[in-house]
From Swiss-Prot:
Biased composition (Basic and acidic residues): 426-435
Biased composition (Low complexity): 222-237, 260-281, 371-392, 414-425, 436-455
Composition skew (Polar residues), residue ranges: 196-211
Gene designation: mybY
Myb-like domain: residues covered: 311-360
PANTHER family given in the database record: MYB-LIKE PROTEIN Y, ZINC FINGER, ZZ DOMAIN CONTAINING 3
Top-level taxon in the UniProt lineage: Eukaryota
Full protein name: Myb-like protein Y
Region described as Disordered: 196-283, 367-456
Length: 572
C-alpha cells in the first residue's frame, strides 16, 4: 500500500503536469491515500488500453468518492494521474539494483518491493532488502545508470545467445510480476509509445539452453537485407581456370596488347572529346552567368507575381518614394522600414520590398547577352569602316519623317520609294517651303554605320543633333529671361509687351523643331517642359482653378492670344 510520502510526491508531480498542459493549476485536485490505493488495486484487474475497462476503473474511484462525499473524478484527470504514476514508477525502477530486488540510494529511504496487491513504497530502514550507498563501492551515478540500462534491456538477449549461460544469471534479474509491469502494459493509449518500446523486447526461455523462437524467426529488415544481397552480387565474379596451355597464354598476351593499343587510342579520343566538352561547358556557363546578370531580379514565384500584378498607379509610386525618403535606411532597419512604409501605403511589407526591388531593377542597365556581343563583333569585322554621305532624300522619305515628328510612329524602310521612281515625279511636287528646306538640309547629313540593336541610336550621338540641342537650350534660357520680365511687369501692375510674348512663342516653336528629331521617344523632349512650369507659375495666381491644368505637349493647343495694345511701340 502507498504511504503519505508517495502520494505527496505524486500530487506535486501531477500539479506540475497541469501547469505544463494548461499554463495553470486551477483544475488540479489532490489525490488522497485511499483514493490512490483503490486506483492501484484496479490497475491489477483492468487493462487501460481498452476504453470500457478504463471506465470501470473510473467508476470504482468515483464510487469511493461518492461514499466519502467527495467530488467525482473525470476521465481526463484519470489519464493525467496514470501518466504521472507511470513516470514515478519508471524513476523508482531506475534505482533498483541489477543484482537484488531493490536499491536504496539514499541509505535510509524506502525500497520498492512487490506484494500486498499493489506496488508501493514501504516504510522501513535501510536494512533488509535495501542496499545503502556505502555498499555500492566505487560505482558512480553514470556507471550505475549504464549498468542498470544494460541489464534491464539487453541481459535477456545476451543470455539467450550465450550457450554456456545457466539459470543462475536469470535468478539475479528482478521479478517481473510487479504492478509496474501490469500498469505499463495496461496504460492509456495516449502513452502507448513507451509501452510498445518495452513490450517489443524478446523474452528468453532457458529451457534446455535453447534459443527462443522469437530470435530465430525474427525477419531481417528490408534495408539490411538489400544491402547484404547487393554486396554478395557485386563480389561474386567468375575467375578463369588456374592452369592453361602455352598457346592460350600467348593468345591472351597478344589480345591484351591489342586491347591496350585500342584502349590508348580510345583514351586519346576521349580526352579530345572531354576537352571540347569542357570548352562547351565553359561557354554555356558564361551564357548562364550573363543571363543571370541580365535578369537581376531572377525568377519570381507565383505569390510575388500576384503581388506585382495588383493595380499600381503613378500616385502610389510617388507615395512610395515619399515614404522611402521619410524612413531612410540609416535610421531604420530593413524590416522596420518596410513595416513603416506598408502602414503609410496600406499594403503588405513584402509588396513594399518587391516594389522597391522593381524600382532598382529599372535603374540598373541590362548588359547585352553573349550572342548579341558575338553578332556585334562579326558585323564590325565585316564592315569595319564608317562612311559619311550627304544625299538628298526623296519626297516620300521626307513625308515619312514629318509623320514621325507629328505622330511619333515609325514606318518600315520598305515603304520608302527608290530614287528612280522619285525622279519620275513632277517638279511641282518637289517644291517645298522654307520650313521643308530647312528640315531637309538638317536631315541630309547622316552617318551610315552597321546596324546594332543594343547600342543607342545614331541620332543621339550625331554632332548635328547635339548642336540642335544646344541651340534649343539657349532659346529656352532666353525664354526664362523674357518670362522674368513678364513676371516683373505683372507684379508692377503694368501690361507686358506683346513682342515679348510673340518672341517666347517663336522660341518655343523653334526649340520643338530642333528637339523633335529624337526618334527613340514618342513623348515630347523634356527641355520645353521648363517653359510649361514657368507659365503655370505665372498664371496660377491670376486665374481660376478650372484653368489650372497642365499645358498640352503641342504648342498650337495652348491658345495664347496676343492683343496689340501698343501699336506705337511696334512701329518704333
Amino acid at each position: 500500500m502507498s504511504d503519505l510520502r508517495e502520494i505527496n510526491r505524486l500530487n506535486k508531480d501531477e500539479e506540475f503536469e497541469y501547469f505544463k498542459l494548461y499554463s495553470n493549476s486551477n483544475g488540479f485536485r489532490k489525490w488522497n491515500l485511499d483514493e490512490h490505493n483503490i486506483f492501484s488495486k484496479a490497475s491489477l484487474e483492468y487493462n487501460f488500453l481498452k476504453p470500457d475497462q478504463m471506465i470501470e476503473i473510473l467508476k470504482l474511484v468515483n464510487q469511493h468518492n461518492s461514499n466519502t462525499s467527495c467530488k467525482a473524478r473525470t476521465l481526463e484527470e484519470l489519464n493525467i494521474h496514470i501518466k504521472v504514476y507511470q513516470n514515478f514508477l519508471n524513476k523508482q525502477q531506475a534505482l533498483r539494483s541489477p543484482t537484488t530486488g531493490s536499491l536504496n540510494i539514499s541509505g535510509f529511504g524506502n525500497p520498492i518491493t512487490s506484494g500486498g496487491g499493489g506496488l508501493g513504497v514501504l516504510g522501513g530502514g535501510g536494512g533488509g532488502g535495501g542496499i545503502s550507498s556505502s555498499s555500492l563501492g566505487g560505482l558512480s551515478g553514470s556507471g550505475l545508470f549504464l549498468n542498470t540500462m544494460v541489464n534491464n534491456t539487453f541481459q535477456t538477449i545476451l543470455d539467450s545467445l550465450d550457450g554456456n549461460s545457466s539459470n543462475n544469471n536469470n535468478n539475479n534479474i528482478p521479478s517481473t510480476s510487479s504492478v509496474k509491469d501490469v500498469v505499463s502494459i495496461g496504460i492509456n493509449p495516449l502513452f502507448q509509445k513507451s509501452v510498445q518500446s518495452q513490450s517489443q523486447l524478446p523474452t528468453a526461455t532457458n529451457n534446455n539452453n535453447k534459443q527462443p523462437l522469437e530470435l530465430i524467426s525474427k525477419p531481417i529488415p528490408t534495408a539490411t537485407a538489400t544491402a547484404t544481397t547487393t554486396a554478395t552480387t557485386t563480389t561474386t565474379t567468375i575467375q578463369p581456370p588456374i592452369g592453361g596451355t602455352k598457346n592460350t597464354v600467348n593468345k591472351e598476351i597478344e589480345q591484351d596488347s591489342n586491347d591496350n593499343d585500342n584502349n590508348n587510342n580510345t583514351n586519346n579520343n576521349n580526352n579530345n572529346n572531354n576537352n571540347n566538352n569542357n570548352n562547351n561547358n565553359n561557354e554555356e556557363k558564361e551564357k548562364q552567368y550573363l543571363n543571370y546578370i541580365n535578369n537581376s531580379l531572377g525568377e519570381l514565384n507565383k505569390k510575388d507575381l500576384k503581388l506585382l500584378n495588383e493595380p499600381w498607379t503613378v500616385e502610389d509610386q510617388k507615395k512610395l518614394e515619399d515614404a522611402l525618403t521619410k524612413y531612410p535606411p540609416s535610421r531604420f532597419s530593413s524590416v522596420s522600414r518596410w513595416q513603416m512604409v506598408s502602414k503609410e501605403l496600406g499594403i503588405s511589407p513584402k509588396a513594399v520590398a518587391l516594389r522597391y526591388n522593381q524600382m532598382l531593377n529599372q535603374l540598373i542597365p541590362k548588359k547585352p547577352s553573349l550572342q548579341q556581343q558575338q553578332q556585334q563583333q562579326q558585323q564590325q569585322q565585316q564592315q569595319p569602316t564608317t562612311t559619311t554621305t550627304t544625299t538628298t532624300k526623296p519626297e516620300q522619305s521626307i513625308k515619312s519623317e514629318e509623320e514621325e515628328q507629328t505622330t511619333g510612329k515609325r514606318k518600315s524602310r520598305s515603304s520608302f520609294s527608290s530614287p528612280s521612281s522619285s525622279s519620275k515625279e513632277s517638279p511641282n511636287k518637289k517644291e517645298k517651303t522654307t520650313h521643308d528646306t530647312t528640315t531637309t538640309t538638317n536631315t541630309a547629313t547622316t552617318t551610315t554605320v552597321t546596324p546594332n540593336m543594343t547600342t543607342p541610336s545614331i541620332i543621339n550621338s550625331s554632332p548635328a543633333i547635339a548642336a540642335n540641342l544646344l541651340e534649343a537650350d539657349s532659346l529656352l534660357q532666353k525664354n526664362n529671361q523674357l518670362l522674368k520680365q513678364i513676371r516683373t511687369s505683372v507684379m508692377q501692375l503694368t501690361d507686358p509687351q506683346s513682342t515679348i510674348l510673340t518672341e517666347v512663342i517663336e522660341n518655343i516653336n523653334n526649340s520643338i523643331q530642333l528637339t523633335g528629331k529624337w526618334k527613340d521617344n514618342i513623348e515630347m523632349p523634356p527641355l520645353p517642359l521648363k517653359v510649361n512650369d514657368l507659365i503655370l507659375s505665372l498664371i496660377s495666381n491670376n486665374t481660376s482653378s478650372s484653368f489650372k491644368k497642365p499645358l498640352s505637349k503641342k504648342v498650337t493647343e495652348w491658345n495664347l492670344v496676343v492683343e496689340d495694345d501698343a501699336p506705337t511701340q511696334d512701329k518704333k
